[in-house]
Amino acid sequence: MHVLRTKNLNNPFFAYYNINSLRYKFDDLKEILSKTPPDILVLAETKIDHTFPNAQFYLEEYYEPTRSDNSCHSGGIIEYIRKGIIRKRLNDFELKSFENIASELTINKVKYFLLSFYRTERKESKIANIKRFFDELSPILNKATSKYDNIILMGDINIDFKDTNSIGNRELKDFMNVFGLQNVIKDNTCFFRDNESSIDVILTNTPRKLFHSNTFELGISDCHKMVGTYLRVHMSRLKSKKITYRSLKNFDSEAFCLELGTKLKQISYENGNVAFDNLVSTYTDLLDRFAPLKCKTIRGNQSRFMNKSLSKAIMKRSALKSKYLKKKTSENRTNFKKQRNLCTKLRDQAIKNDFDEAFSDLNSNSKPFYDILKPYLTNKGALCNTDISLSENNNILSNDIEIANIFNEYYTNIVEHTSGNRPKNKADDLPTGSSFDIILDNITKTYEDHPSIKAIHNRKSDSQHTPFKFKPVKIKNVFNLLKSLDAKKAVGIDGIPPLILKISAKILAEPLTRIINICISDNVFPTLAKLASILPFFKKGDRSNKKNYRPVSVLSSLSKIFGKILQNQLIDFSNSFLSKYITSYRKGHSTQHVLIRLIEDWKAKLDNGFYVGAIMMDLSKAFDCISHDLLIAKMNAYKFDKSALKLIYSYLKGRRQCVKINSSSSNYQTIISGVPQGSILGPILFNIFINDLYFFFPNDNLFGFADDHSISNSSTSLEELKGKLSDDSKVAIDWLDNNQMIANPSKFQAIILNKSKDHILTDINIEGHNIKSSDLVTLLGIDIDDKINFDSHIGKLCTKTGGQLNCLYRFNKYLSVSAKKLAINSYIYSNFSYCPLVWHCSSTKSKNSIENMQKRALKLFDDSHSLGDFKPGKSSMEVKRLRSLAIEIYKTLNHLNPNYMFEIFKPSENRSSERLKHNIASQRFKQVKFGKNSIRVLGPKLWNSLPNQVKSLPTLESFKNFMKTWGNKDCKYYDKYISYVQAI
């Protein structure tokens, strides 16, 4: 196979292989195919399900694999498409009753229809199963042949193609005749015991375009050979991926810092912008000598534990199996079995050695632990997007520079592409070089009658008489920011790694502080600090569509330092006028708080017999749509001094970006609207811009976090409720239109809740769009059902956790006790730590499911080991959530939480009594379902059961330390805990 592949390297190679359980053979497959990788690889009988993340089966040279799973015991297929081939999944062309994947492949501008399948034997009779298979396949082929000239079907059809007397052979041949298909595989493909058959097929309507169709013995599957064929098309290969990095092999930090200090003294500090440029160039020139830039080629990932002896054993096993299939003697069979067992033994030993080495010192270095286990437990951060091909104007583009320029044009004009309107700024209509005073005057006059500006003027408080100015910064503050840089963050456009900045912080702090203070004095943000490189990351959908990639900005670390200094001062001032309901990007605020407020508001209304409804709004490109001029006008209305406005205007204007694809970059383009979402200042500027939206909802029925906003309302009448939601939505849409933001009513979600068991599915008219309410919506990552029992959300959490536990059980014999503890804390418990108080009052069934997850996790530990904190008597998951609830109440009463949390946890009015002065007011309720089962009722019972000396602890840290033992038998106040449990 290797010789054949080498000779036809530029011809696409299609391969299909019934592997019979992928989870145990994936590393062997990677090793065998590393030298002869197919371009399209389909594996059948994978025997994996949703509990196995894609990251576990990721191959470096391929896109993220596509799967059609059955169960972890049978069936299933997985499809790999090599990077550089345009692939689009065709869900409408897929069979409903069998595992299959339909794809449209574009190779050299020619489209091919590929259907990969595995026909499993069902409980029904084989004849009925075959009939159903062809009955489903025929209409699909009818559609495919009318759209595509080139059809390829690959799969294990479980019908012996060569045996004319076999069941289903006649039906297969009739089907092939109808659609003009031929099977290009002529040899037997399956060798089960003493029976040989040809059940793996490659069918096509253009056999002349395929050549060297054959079977290949890999020695991995129990009884199947791999079938493959070459496409008679010349396909250019992607170039090897190369990366540029700084070599720290001979880096002398002391000599570098010594020379850096000398060089920086020679910089002129008359102009902050010029001084910043000189500092960066001086730093990079010196860094190029001490840590030169180097380039290296990235090879395909080999399994961590693969070594020479195991690799040789795998190759020898393949050869011995091939020899046995050619000549089935007892000696050849024995030799093959011995080699197969040796491979298993060597693999287990290699994995154990690798794990022992990686887990040898988890306390000081846990990175190897995450490197090994992460791909088996989650897809997060595991799949990259380095090789991209785009479809643009009916052309397929694979040149990195062309693609980078297309992305950059799209991202810099994303508002125009989304809404059809190009953002305008007053400076565009003024003579070039106009002073900021003239620009500000024009902006102020343009927006003086704007609804938002009027609303801001009407809501200004007395505390805002002193205009805000940016103040100079101290060397100590800059030094601390330099030392706090994350050394793992990406390197910005200036090529200076954060690690080197941390090393040289003592030398760099003084000159950098001086430059920053000059810029603050001159009201200028350095031009070089406004440059960004953009990395496109694939989201979902068609990979050849540029709209399916989100931009991730990479800024220089020095730019982040300057941004952090401005941000700290902006936060202090903006807190004086920001709505208390603005939750995102604020200290002490979280998604849990806004969701608790929403859910508790719903439950209170439902407890009183109201209908409750909510609209989840869809804001398209919210950060990108912000008008620079309108933002400046709003900040002016909020009493920002002219000098501060000039500095912010300088920060926003003239920002430029390029897009990077591998080692290629696009041209720079100027950003004309929006605030950079990945920047330090972007989030706080977004909050300032959107703050006045809350002024238009005097009933405080707007709930938001970042660009996710929901409107809630209630009524005793369903029709009246629908009218209220429609009117409220119009208010929000009008605000968005007036503020040049894009609302998409057709994508709004709606939910209606009531106290009865019936679901209410109705239409709500919003600006001419009929929005159908649903019984389940997703908000900020939480699935919320119309009965607020969170069964769906907790079910998903338990399913995810169950899959991760399955993985840990498979690795159990390789994991040390400390590694198991780390794995459970990092992955199992973390699943239930996101907004746990939101869904705490769930059904008993759901709570029991969570407890069972913990019990199953604890069974990973053998009785022979010291379990430490993981002893069977470990606190239940419910006790953990109650501890979290007590901490939230403590934070609320001590003003460490958003002020609106006082609406839920109200201090007791009886402050004169020494015994009751630390209590919170008990809440009345009418019904158990929505009244008693709520945080506002449960919280006071929990808090008031705690001893006063605990509730009055002076610091949050001391309170947390106490709560770690609350509920345990060794707790000082265990009797109080028992009384509380009996009370609820």
Sequence positions of predicted segments:
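Basic, alpha-helical interaction scaffolds
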Residues: 251-284, 771-838
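Conserved catalytic palm subdomain of right-hand nucleotidyl-transferase polymerases, strongest
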Residues: 152-154, 487-496, 534, 545-554, ...
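Active site of divalent-metal-dependent phosphoester/diester hydrolases
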Residues: 64-79, 161-168, 179-206, 265-269, ...
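Short, conserved micro-motifs composed of acidic
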Residues: 188-209, 214, 727, 742-776
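Arg/Lys-enriched, amphipathic patches
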Residues: 112-117, 126-127, 150-164, 234-400, ...
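Surface-exposed loop/turn segments and immediately adjacent short secondary-structure elements
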Residues: 230, 234-236, 259, 274, ...
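Conserved polymerase palm-domain catalytic core
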Residues: 580, 619-706, 715
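Short phosphate/oxyanion-binding micro-motifs
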Residues: 1-147, 163, 172-181, 504, ...
